[in-house]
Curated annotation (Swiss-Prot):
Efflux is inhibited by the ionophore carbonyl cyanide 3-chlorophenylhydrazone (CCCP). Activity is inhibited by extract of milk thistle seeds and reserpine, a synthetic plant alkaloid. The chain crosses the membrane at residues 15-35, 52-72, 82-102, 107-127, 141-161, 171-191, 226-246, 255-275, 290-310, 311-331, 352-372, 377-397. Coiled coil: none annotated. One of its GO terms (molecular function) is sodium:proton antiporter activity. It is a multi-pass membrane protein. CDD domains: MFS_MdfA_MDR_like. GO terms for cellular component: plasma membrane. The lineage of its organism: Bacteria, Pseudomonadati, Pseudomonadota, Gammaproteobacteria, Enterobacterales. Belongs to the major facilitator superfamily. The keyword Cell inner membrane applies. Residues 1-14, 73-81, 128-140, 192-225, 276-289, 332-351, 398-413 are cytoplasmic. This is Multidrug resistance protein MdtM. Keywords: Antibiotic resistance, Antiport, Cell inner membrane, Cell membrane, Membrane, Transmembrane, Transmembrane helix, Transport. It is found in: Cell inner membrane.
Length: 413
């Protein structure tokens, strides 16, 4: 018995904490991906307008912005552990509450509360991983977490489409609530504490000062711009693709689910390449090799749909190529933005996520407007413009990171 206890205590941080975080993150993804094939059915069940379908995603993202300003500084002061555990509890209750919704408004409110899981996971959970492990190990562990979690967008639509042939869509949220409860138990048992509680008092003045310092940091600003813009091609596709492929394209929910597999599968493959084959994912040479892949995907989106229009081929192929390219470097960009400064990491992470989620929520609404008022090409043009700008912000980010590292080395000498 003592050996069993010793086994679990030794592996709590290195194994069971990442597993619990993965389950929490996986469940949060499923609230969108499992229901996306049936989101048109949800709208019809509540007798709402079909144009509200993408709002399920945009309000989820808005929920992800709601508490960022509080959770980062709070976790810097009272600890990462109590904040993340509270988030898992709120998420579980919000998923269970969806079972009781009777209108589209209630459903969207529940989606907003579910979206707060982004605040807790990204602001507190990912930072804990980065703090608990060294640079290369943390990057590779984040790549593993991302790969496993992104199975949700692959199997989520397929599973959701299959399950909705047998059960009501609300049952899916009941399943996710159970997953959230299991993640909550895992975090209670295994999550480490990586900050000293009470080292800095919590006050409005100190919080505002930390945020001011973050938003004055040039590396943070460049990294936040790079990361947020790089999300736009994929998030706009995730949000608007049900309308494009099911409502306008005539696809069945099963066909729609299969059409999403290449996009998220590309990110998973990219992350596995980083974990298994790349010795140092922070090398500029490796990072720049991913850029032509991203640009080829964006070119495919526009040229394919312009020259040989197809209901899904060029959209899926182009988005998949882009996803593969950005998936190879995303964990590294996150690490650069978070740790290339001496600022409180919870506040840095909160600031980063506020920027990313604001850009994502706005891009979803802009993408929806472009689709309904301009069609396929203007919609994909949004992704192309964002992807091209990323190349320039990435170059600036790498230059500033090199300057920061050189300054640190000089200071040590």
């Amino acid at each position: 018995m003592q050996r069993i206890i010793q086994f679990f205590s030794q592996r709590a941080t290195t194994l069971f904490f990442p597993m619990a975080l993965i389950l929490y993150d996986f469940a949060a993804y499923l609230t969108t991906d499992l229901i996306q094939p049936g989101i048109i059915n949800v709208v019809r069940d509540f007798n709402a307008d079909v144009s509200l379908a993408p709002a399920s995603v945009s309000l989820y993202l808005a929920g992800g912005m709601a508490l960022q300003w509080l959770l980062g500084p709070l976790s810097d002061r009272i600890g990462r552990r109590p904040v993340l555990i509270a988030g898992a509890l709120i998420f579980t209750l919000a998923c269970a509450a969806t079972l009781l919704t009777t209108s589209m408004t209630q459903f969207l409110v529940a989606r907003f509360v579910q979206g707060t899981s982004i605040c807790f996971i990204a602001t507190v959970g990912y930072v804990t991983v980065q703090e608990a492990f060294g640079q290369t190990k943390a990057i590779k562990l984040m790549a593993i977490i991302t790969s496993i979690v992104l199975v949700a967008p692959v199997i989520g639509p397929l599973s959701g489409a299959a399950l909705m042939h047998f059960v009501h869509w609300k049952v899916l949220f009941g399943i996710i609530a159970v997953m959230g409860l299991l993640a909550l138990c895992g975090l209670l048992l295994a999550m480490p504490e990586t900050v000293q509680r009470g080292a800095v008092p919590f006050s409005a003045v100190s919080v505002l000062r930390d945020f001011r310092n973050v938003f004055r940091n040039p590396i943070f600003l460049t990294g936040a711009a790079t990361l947020s813009l790089s999300y736009i091609p994929m998030m706009s596709w995730v949000a608007v693709s049900p309308v494009i492929l099911i409502d306008a394209g005539g696809m069945s929910t099963s066909q729609f689910a299969w059409a999403q597999v290449p996009v998220f599968g590309a990110v998973i493959v990219a992350n596995m390449i980083v974990v298994r084959l790349v010795k140092d994912p922070t090398r500029p040479r490796f990072i720049w090799r991913a850029v032509p892949i991203q640009l080829s995907g964006l070119a495919t989106l526009l040229l394919g749909n312009l020259l040989l229009p197809h209901v899904w081929l060029w959209s899926v192929l182009g988005t998949s190529l882009y996803a593969f390219g950005i998936g190879m470097i995303f964990p590294t960009l996150f690490r650069f933005t978070l740790f290339s400064n001496n600022l409180p990491k919870g506040t840095v992470s909160a600031s980063l996520n506020m920027v990313i989620l604001t850009v994502m929520a706005v891009s979803v609404e802009v993408g929806r407007w472009l689709w309904f008022h301009g069609g396929r090409l203007p919609f994909h043009l949004l992704a192309a413009v964002a992807g091209v700008i990323v190349v320039f912000t990435l170059a600036t980010l790498l230059q500033r990171v090199r300057q920061h590292e050189a300054a640190e080395l000089a200071a040590e000498k």
